């Protein structure tokens, strides 16, 4: 076959490959197709075009009619629920109808052609059939499960000869008529045909599984229990092993059944309705590892959207960049030996340290030091929400005091209730976290390995998961946070998931307390809320669905710390979860509708303003102990006892909620953002001990803040130059402090991120220097122009004085000459203004026609990022009426309409021309007013056009923003957060 013929065959493909069918994308028909190439997937085309085997119209009509008949039969049974005798007669009638249907099914099965063989979809619809005299009626398409129970214990009734003959006929017909490919559902009244024996057996098993349900009534959010008024009757099907089971009727009145409208498609169901969740519906971003060894997915709120290297584990970084980078890689579990040398299977046994060795290891002087450091620096951001500090420290001191008395130590670690508060794995995890604040990475690895060994390896050296306890749960969460700081993202996520599952196994989410043991109740409550906070932090940071759920309408219970900061932080997280979810929810159906995306964007922007107000209300509602503002922060920053963790949590929530809009020239509450940046600078610059900042909450808040500052600085122009110059200085400071405070050589998670930020800021710093030089040159040119104008005014005044001294007959000639000079000067000034406009930096002329939409966007962005410094002048809620804001939105969303580009270009040109004319008119009017006030009656009424002379002359606007590539990447980059939310992606990650 020639290549040309092969190409034609590929172009004639009428079916899509399996990958394109899965992701619902258009397939180009190539082998492999473009979508499979981009995803490194195997391109497989189905051998059979199922469209050629569609159901016939007659077959579909039969299904619809049969479905309606089944619905009528169910409704007739429900109507007779209060009359047992009539109900029995109706059931007998249905059985007789099914028997007559079986007699006609053989003759009509061959008459309906074009119907495919009985498939799963047909089988699920044909769920009404008889089984040896037993009736089961079910309609899944109508969402109903209806069981007919014929009680054989209360009343024995012998079957009539007619029913026996019907049963025999049913059995014979079933055995003698296998399902044929051309079989179909007949239009015979009352009931569907009986399927083949294999299908009967399968359905019999499904029915047995359904009969295990203890409650035969609809379960939903509105049903309180078996005594509810809408409970369905006790009508169930009984399956017996014999084909000759008799039929009996329970003469006792059944419970009342709900009456459903005959026209409605819904029927009662035995399946519980899913609980509502306020989790995030995010479009995931996938980061494949080198060689495709793993695949990590992150949602829209994640901070890991700047670079692929941010999400790599240490082993992936080592494979990608080699072993030159210093890795904080954990050691394997020590002392592993092979118990068998068999080549087919090798049994692994871990030789754990003895209890004496472990006690000595966790009670030496170095361990005591690091244990104290953990509660000094790690308590405020995390441990205070998870571990009862006083109780754990007291028990650890007792262990250290009795370290030579092994029996006493074993009693503390193994007997109730002290074993609910402390364990070896928890002590080792705390020592490892304390070693991190001493930059002792070897000690971190040593004690972290010890903690994980005690968690999962028993005394026999075997891997176990059958023990749950609160100290083990706490140790898992602490180890997960340490793993995250060391760059092991997958390990941290999975370890925290095991811990949360263990908490559910312990029942810490039940909120049921025993007054006889208040200490355990307080511990259970504290561990739940600490786990909840860590779970929500992880969900926001990774952009993933969380595990623990708390309804914000339910009163919260905080037993051990009613007046502390735990209720404040928990309430903040609970209230903001639905807010963040609504901001980040992906709307994939508007992908090809820019106008709808624009509408959704404006709606979410409007919601964002209300959410920011709610955040401000939460902050203002704090008690005096925890409330802060900029002035309070300045006065208390040098006090080391002041806890700033609640402030950092507030910053993190605000930055996550506003992240998509902070990456636009105009799009968020810039005033609050400026306030947060200033406060964060004060904390990081003047805090007495910067080790209090060495935690993951500070790290993620700092990463989001730097990303937002990079975006804002990228939009620098003449209007916002002053504010963005301040942003640039703060950006440089934050990156320097990030390397100092977060120990990038110890916390591998920071190393590559910090390097990327440094490269980006160096580039922006060069652009800012160039912009500053241009603006300085422009300012000098303006000063020279003003000096020339002042000289011109002085000459005019001197000439006027000379005119007053000259004879009257010479004045007229001199006045004519002066008017001519004024006209020439006016023409010359207009030419200078035009030349100045032309000399401004513009995109290259040769690319105007080739890339005009991009040029148009860059020119329209010169006024899009004016700083909002006064809420009264520029309130955030009035941005929907802001012309510059709406112009930015048009650039974002109308860009994808290629057919309207020419019309849009003409409109933008006309709009720009009109704006320029209006600006010139306004300037001329202002100049005339100033001249009228300064000039005397003898001076000419028309002077050469000159710019206005305010106190601070306005700097001409530059036609380009500082770094237009950043804005363009928001629209073009498929991996951007803004792109994932508002459906800009042309390829996307929605697999």
From Swiss-Prot:
Keyword set includes Nucleotide-binding: no
Protein name: Transcription factor ROB1
Keyword presence, Methyltransferase: no
Domain of life: Eukaryota
SMART domains tied to this protein: Fungal_trans, GAL4
Composition bias type Low complexity, residue spans: 152-168, 795-806, 907-931
GO cellular component assignments: chromatin; nucleus
Task of the protein: Transcription factor that mediates conventional biofilm formation and plays a key role in microcolony formation under both flow and static conditions and to epithelial surfaces. Modulates infection of mammalian hosts.
Expression induction: Induced during biofilm formation. Expression is dependent on both auto-regulation and cooperative interactions with other network transcription factors such as NDT80, TEC1 and EFG1. Expression is also induced during mammalian infection. Expression is repressed by caspofungin and caffeic acid phenethyl ester (CAPE).
One protein family per Pfam: Fungal_trans
Organism: Candida albicans (strain SC5314 / ATCC MYA-2876)
GO molecular function, one term: DNA-binding transcription factor activity, RNA polymerase II-specific
Compositional bias ranges of the Polar residues kind: 169-187
Keywords from the UniProt entry: DNA-binding, Metal-binding, Nucleus, Transcription, Transcription regulation, Zinc
Null allele phenotype: Severely reduces biofilm formation. Causes defects in proliferation. Displays abnormal colony morphology and invasive growth.
Predominant cellular place of this UniProt entry's protein: nucleus
Location within or outside the cell: Nucleus
GO biological process terms on file: DNA-templated transcription; filamentous growth; filamentous growth of a population of unicellular organisms in response to biotic stimulus; positive regulation of filamentous growth of a population of unicellular organisms in response to biotic stimulus; regulation of single-species biofilm formation on inanimate substrate; regulation of transcription by RNA polymerase II; single-species biofilm formation on inanimate substrate
The entry's DNA-binding region: 17-43
Compositional bias segments (type: Basic and acidic residues): 807-817, 825-855
